[in-house]
Every structure is written in C-alpha cells, then in structure tokens.
Amino acid sequence: MSDTVDRLRAALANRYTIERELGAGGMATVYLAHDLRHDRQVALKVLRQELTAALGAERFHREIQIAAKLQHPNILPLLDSGEAGGLLFYAMPYVEGQSLRERLAREGALPVPDTVRILRDVLDALTEAHSHGVVHRDIKPENIMLRGRHALVTDFGVAKAVSEATGRQTLTTAGVALGTPAYMAPEQASADPHLDHRVDIYAVGAVAYELLTGRPVFMGTTPQMVLSAHVTEAPQPITRFREAVPRALEALVMRCLAKQPADRW
C-alpha cells in the first residue's frame, strides 16, 4: 500500500494531497484527498494494478468520459480521471455520510419507508443514465451513498470498462473483482455479451430484496454457487422472511428479479 501511495503522491503532487485511505475493495482502493486546484476534499479511487493492466488508459478514459457527462441530483459526479504513476484513477466528491452497505451492516433490514425512498432515488439516477444509453452494470449497496435523506449512485462507467477488458473467458474472476455476484443478472452471470439496461433493473431488485429481508437473494459458499443460483433458482418470497412487507412492493421486487430480461419492469 505504501508503494502505491508514494507513487500517487509523486505523480499527483501538483494536483492532489493524499490524506488517508478510506477503504479498499476488489476493484479499487479509495483515498481521501485534497484537490489543490479547487480547494476541496475528494474521494480518489485508484484501480488495482491488474485491472489497470487489463484496461489500458485509452479504454478507461473512453468509458469513464461517457459517464462523466451524466448530471443528476442522485448521481455522484465524476470530477477528474487520469493516469498517475502507472495507475488509473478517478475522483468524485467526498460524501460526508455512509454507504448503503454500511447502513445494512449496522441495522440489517431497513424500514419499508426508508427502503422505498432509497430505491426511488436509485431508480431516478438510473432512469437518467439509461436515457443517455449508459448502463451501470454494478449496482450494489457499496455503490450507493447516503447523504441525509438522499441516495447517490456512484461509479458509472467503471464496471463496463472493467468487464469488457477482462473478457468473457474471465467473467467469474471479473465478477469477484467487482464484488457483484450477489447482484448479477442471469445474463451477466451467463457471460452474455449483449447486456442492456435491464441488468440494472435486476440489480435494483436484488438490492431491494436485501433491504427488505436483511439477506441477499441468493447465498452460497463460493461466488460460482451464487452466480449459478441467479441463473437457475427462484428467489424465496420476501414475506417468508418479513411478513409485514406490502404485497404490492414484494410483487414489484420479484418482477425486477425475473430471469428473462423481457419480463422485468
């Protein structure tokens, strides 16, 4: 980690001051940094070395610049991106709040009104992105930030670039790296190269299921078992785990989780 930080500090010395590590996932390490040009704090996300090698700077910039054009109150905007010290990075506003994953870890299943409000914000963000032809491909609680009563979706453009760079033959590895098996649509899990906005609808359904029940749609001892379940198994009814969930809401979530994309909302 220190080697990476040293390389970043040296390469970005005139643009950012790296303050501390905020967290690390399968795809990137996130640092709190100070934007020297604009005197503001940002979240600087640095892709893992192997993903940087697989992507290449040109493809990364192409995909992330498409996403950078998105402007919406529920989309965390892209502020900057580039290559530094042989590493690919992008910067977003630093959100004083928590991720949806952090809230789930602390509280488990959320109240129905909170769940509906969060989902409405996420769907508003996705509607805007989809209207511009941008598919997220990696909707999950880690990529939903909570600020006050509002939810913001992060990391548009990154998942598409990574999944295309890693290729179909390494989809399972890519899925693990992205941390998405629990939210992958069947067509993603099956390595279908022709994905569209309906993979995001499925992922929202998977997130909604977890918000309402406190557990993922499918669980398994390996990522491959979870991916297989998305393709072949029917989800348990939400009301099996939480009887008080309105039936209309349960029906909506289950329709989002339809195996066939044409059957989703």
Where are these regions (language model features)?
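Activation segment of protein kinases
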Residues: 52-55, 148-194, 221
